[in-house]
């Protein structure tokens, strides 16, 4: 009886083991097969760019000021007017400059008359001195009279020299007065558009220490872009790199140029440091305007016809620019070591390790998993 119970117990244990094995086998056979997100490796182009926000300004902008003091009698332009080089923009009351010219001219006339008188007196002094010399030979006059005549002649000669110096000084004053009269006419130093008027007609300007600004001219045929670049990106920039931008009102049109320079002085914005990279673009149609916001792209690298894969396909690093990559072949995955080159925010160049047509794993998902 005891032996039967032992045999029965063994059968039960064996049955449990078999059932457990069958359940395990069923689970293995019915386990969901992993599915992979893959990409076929193909040649393509890879660009690496720095993104920045910029502002537009005119390439050439000039503050037109007054070089003489006085009331702005007329202002012939308004904001937005287009002007030509040497076009009359305004006039400062010329009365003071005209009166100064008249005053200096009158002084010059007086000095020239004095010079004529001094020349006549010098001529008389020379005649007197010659006569005194002849009389002195006959002892008809004393040596003192002869010396007096010589002194008188020298004094008259010196008077002419003094008058000549005064004439030169006043001639210079006359030239300055005429120049000041010319300065009362404010003309455009270049062709451009009036973008700002600082002094209104009727206001008085004082040019005692520095030229007061009347208006601002901008040449809008070419624009200067100032791109605000972070300190992390600025180390990659250098003159000559390609740059392009779009504006908010026309995101489909690209305006292209080359980096001109990177200003050395940074700007601090909310504890972040930024530098300004500048480049020029033509504006023949006048569509670009002052202070427009530009979405700037500065191209760091541009490689053509190279093998690229997404950054998400890179596995663990195994050395300098070397990574593991999973390949899918005949439903099975294999790891392969690759060497990378240029990269951007989404893709990377494969220098070695893959061929066109290889299928790389970029992700893995199981059926029923949330996508």
Curated annotation (Swiss-Prot):
One Gene Ontology term from the biological process aspect of the record: response to antibiotic
Result of altering residue 353 to S: 2-fold increase in susceptibility to macrolides
Membrane topology recorded in Swiss-Prot or TrEMBL: Single-pass membrane protein
Chain segments annotated as transmembrane: 11-31
Cytoplasmic side: 1-10
Gene3D superfamilies per the UniProt record, alphabetical: 2.40.30.170, 2.40.420.20, 2.40.50.100, 6.10.140.1990
Keywords: Antibiotic resistance, Cell inner membrane, Cell membrane, Coiled coil, Membrane, Transmembrane, Transmembrane helix, Transport
Pfam families found in the cross-reference section: HlyD_D23
Molecular function in Gene Ontology: efflux transmembrane transporter activity; identical protein binding; polymyxin transmembrane transporter activity
Cell location: Cell inner membrane
Main location: membrane
Keyword Cell membrane applies: yes
Family: Belongs to the membrane fusion protein (MFP) (TC 8.A.1) family.
Subunit structure: Homohexamer. Part of the tripartite efflux system MacAB-TolC, which is composed of an inner membrane transporter, MacB, a periplasmic membrane fusion protein, MacA, and an outer membrane component, TolC. The complex forms a large protein conduit and can translocate molecules across both the inner and outer membranes. MacA interacts with MacB and TolC, and this interaction changes its conformation.
Role description: Part of the tripartite efflux system MacAB-TolC. MacA stimulates the ATPase activity of MacB by promoting the closed ATP-bound state of MacB, increases the capacity of MacB to bind macrolides such as erythromycin, and provides a physical link between MacB and TolC. When overexpressed, the system confers resistance against macrolides composed of 14- and 15-membered lactones but no or weak resistance against 16-membered ones. In addition, MacA binds tightly rough-core lipopolysaccharide (R-LPS), suggesting that the system could also transport R-LPS or a similar glycolipid.
Name used for this protein in its record: Macrolide export protein MacA
Organism: Escherichia coli (strain K12)
Gene encoding the protein: macA
């Amino acid at each position: 009886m005891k032996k039967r119970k032992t045999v029965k117990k063994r059968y039960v244990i064996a049955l449990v083991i078999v059932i457990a094995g069958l359940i395990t086998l069923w689970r293995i056979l019915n386990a969901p097969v992993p599915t992979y997100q893959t990409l076929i490796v193909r040649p393509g182009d890879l660009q690496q760019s720095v993104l920045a926000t910029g502002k537009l300004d005119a390439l050439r902008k000039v503050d037109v000021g007054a070089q003489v003091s006085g009331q702005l009698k007329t202002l012939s332009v308004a904001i937005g007017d287009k002007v030509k080089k040497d076009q009359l923009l305004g006039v400062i009351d010329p009365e003071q400059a005209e009166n100064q010219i008249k005053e200096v001219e009158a002084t010059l006339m007086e000095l020239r008359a004095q010079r004529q008188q001094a020349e006549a007196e010098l001529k008389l002094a020379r005649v007197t001195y010659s006569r005194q010399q002849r009389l002195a030979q006959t002892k008809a006059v004393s040596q003192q009279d002869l010396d007096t005549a010589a002194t008188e002649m020298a004094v008259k000669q010196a008077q002419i020299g003094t008058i000549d110096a005064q004439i030169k000084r006043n001639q210079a004053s006359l030239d300055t007065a005429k120049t000041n009269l010319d300065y009362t006419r404010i003309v455009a130093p270049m062709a451009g558009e009036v973008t700002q008027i600082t002094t209104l007609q009727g206001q008085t300007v004082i040019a005692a220490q520095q030229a007061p600004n009347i208006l601002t001219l901008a040449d809008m045929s070419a624009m200067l872009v100032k791109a605000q670049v972070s300190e992390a990106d600025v180390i990659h920039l250098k003159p000559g790199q390609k740059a392009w931008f779009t504006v908010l009102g026309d995101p489909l049109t690209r305006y292209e140029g080359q980096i001109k320079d990177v200003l050395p002085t940074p700007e601090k914005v909310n504890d972040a440091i930024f530098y300004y990279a500048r480049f020029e673009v033509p504006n023949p149609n006048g569509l670009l305007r002052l202070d427009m916001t530009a979405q700037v792209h500065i191209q760091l690298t541009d490689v053509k016809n190279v093998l690229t894969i997404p950054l998400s396909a890179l596995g663990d690093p195994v050395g300098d620019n070397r990574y593991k990559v999973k390949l899918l072949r005949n439903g099975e995955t294999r790891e392969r070591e690759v060497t990378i080159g240029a990269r951007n925010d989404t893709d990377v160049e494969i220098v070695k390790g893959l061929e066109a047509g290889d299928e790389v794993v970029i992700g893995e998902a199981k059926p029923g998993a949330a996508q």
